[in-house]
A protein has these predicted regions:
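N-terminal export signals
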Residues: 6-32
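A domain-start/cap signature at the N-terminus of enzymes
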Residues: 12, 34-97, 137, 170, ...
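The conserved beta1-alpha1 loop
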Residues: 101-102, 242
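Active-site machinery of serine-nucleophile hydrolases
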Residues: 106-171
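Gly/Ser-rich "nucleophile elbow"/oxyanion-hole loop immediately N-terminal to the catalytic nucleophile
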Residues: 153-197
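Primarily recognizes the serine-hydrolase "nucleophile elbow" in alpha/beta-hydrolase
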Residues: 190-232
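C-terminal catalytic histidine-bearing segment of alpha/beta-hydrolase fold enzymes
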Residues: 237, 241, 247-300
C-alpha cells in the first residue's frame, strides 16, 4: 500500500496534465486514503524545484495568463470602502464561493494588487477552464488596507498596530462582502471556502476562529503570526501548507497551530515543503490534490 510519504511525493511529481485535469481525482483518493491527519506534517519534496514541479508551475502560469481579466471590479461601501474582485461562473444554480485573502503585498485600495504578484496562484487556479468545468464556483478576492487581523482600536487611532483577539477589521469587512454576495447571487451556503497566504493565511485563521462553523473548509499558506492559535472552529477542515525554510514566517508558527488544533480535537492536514522559503503558495496552489479536496468538503 502507498505510504503517506510516497503519496505526497507522487503528488509532487505528477504530470502537468494531471495537475489540473478532472481525472486527477483517481489518484487523489488513493493519496488521501494513505494519509492520516494525525500524522506529523508531511515533508514533501521542495527546493530546488524538481523538473516535474517546475513544469507544473510554469504550465499553471501559462494556462492562467490573463484570467485576472475575468474578475469584475466592485466595492462595498460603509464606514470605509473595501474594494473587491468577483469572478462569476458561466454555470447556473447554487454554486460554491471561494474566498481568497491576499498577503501584505496585495494591500491597498487600487483593486488590482490582490490579483497580482504572488497572488496569481491563489486567485487564478479556480478559474482554469478544466477546474470551472468540474467545479464551477464564484471567486471573491477582497482587498484590505487594514490588514486581516484584529488591532486594538484605541491604539490603532494613534497609529499603533497591536494585534489582539477578536474579529479583524479587514476580515470583518470581507465577511460583510461575503454576506452581501450571498444575498445577490445563488451561493451554496454549505460550500463557502476561505484561504489565504502569509498575512492572508493569518486572516484565514482569524475568520474561521471568529465566525465558527461558517466555512466548509480552509486552505492556509504560511499563515502569519496572529492571536489565533489554531483551535478555533475545530470542526472546519483545514489544509495547512508551509515551507520548512521560511525566513519570513517561521514554520514553527504553523507547527504550533496544527499541534494545538489536533490536541483540541481537530483533524487538520498539514504539508511542509523541504527547502522552500516564504513563497510556498507556488507549491500549495499547484498541488494536484488541493482542488479536489477543497470541493469535496461541505458544511453540515
Amino acid at each position: 500500500m502507498m505510504t503517506r510519504r510516497d503519496a505526497v511525493r507522487w503528488l509532487g511529481s505528477a504530470s502537468v496534465g494531471a495537475c489540473f485535469a478532472a481525472s486527477a481525482a483517481s489518484f487523489v483518493a488513493e493519496a488521501f486514503a494513505a494519509a492520516t491527519d494525525e500524522a506529523p506534517p508531511t515533508l514533501a519534496p521542495g527546493a530546488p524545484m524538481s523538473p516535474e514541479r517546475l513544469a507544473l508551475i510554469e504550465a499553471f502560469k501559462k494556462q492562467s495568463d490573463g484570467l485576472e481579466k475575468k474578475y469584475e471590479a466592485r466595492a462595498l461601501k460603509g464606514d470605509w470602502t473595501m474594494p473587491y474582485r468577483l469572478f462569476k461562473p458561466e454555470a447556473t444554480g447554487k454554486l460554491p464561493l471561494v474566498v481568497y485573502l491576499h498577503g501584505s503585498g496585495g494591500q491597498g485600495d487600487d483593486n488590482l494588487k490582490q490579483l497580482g504578484l504572488g497572488n496569481i496562484f491563489g486567485t487564478r487556479v479556480w478559474l482554469l477552464p478544466e477546474n470551472q468545468k468540474k467545479f464551477p464556483c464564484y471567486v471573491l478576492a477582497p482587498q484590505s488596507n487594514h490588514g486581516w487581523a484584529h488591532y486594538d482600536p484605541a491604539k490603532l487611532e494613534k497609529g499603533v498596530y497591536e494585534m489582539v483577539p477578536g474579529m479583524g477589521q479587514g476580515a470583518g469587512k470581507a465577511l460583510e462582502v461575503i454576506d452581501a454576495l450571498r444575498k445577490e447571487f445563488p451561493v451554496d451556503d454549505q460550500r463557502i471556502y476561505v484561504m489565504g497566504q502569509s498575512m492572508g493565511g493569518g486572516g484565514t485563521w482569524n475568520m474561521i476562529t471568529n465566525r465558527p462553523n461558517f466555512f466548509a473548509a480552509a486552505a492556509i499558506c504560511c499563515g502569519s503570526i496572529t492571536p489565533e492559535d489554531g483551535t478555533g472552529s475545530i470542526e472546519t477542515p483545514v489544509w495547512n501548507f508551509h515551507g520548512d525554510s521560511d525566513n519570513t514566517v517561521p514554520v514553527s508558527v504553523s507547527r504550533e497551530r496544527i499541534a494545538a488544533r489536533r490536541k483540541a480535537g481537530g483533524h487538520p492536514l498539514a504539508t511542509e515543503y523541504a527547502g522552500v522559503d516564504h513563497n510556498v503558495w507556488e507549491w500549495a496552489f499547484t498541488e494536484p490534490a488541493l482542488v479536489t479536496w477543497l470541493f469535496a468538503q461541505r458544511r453540515g
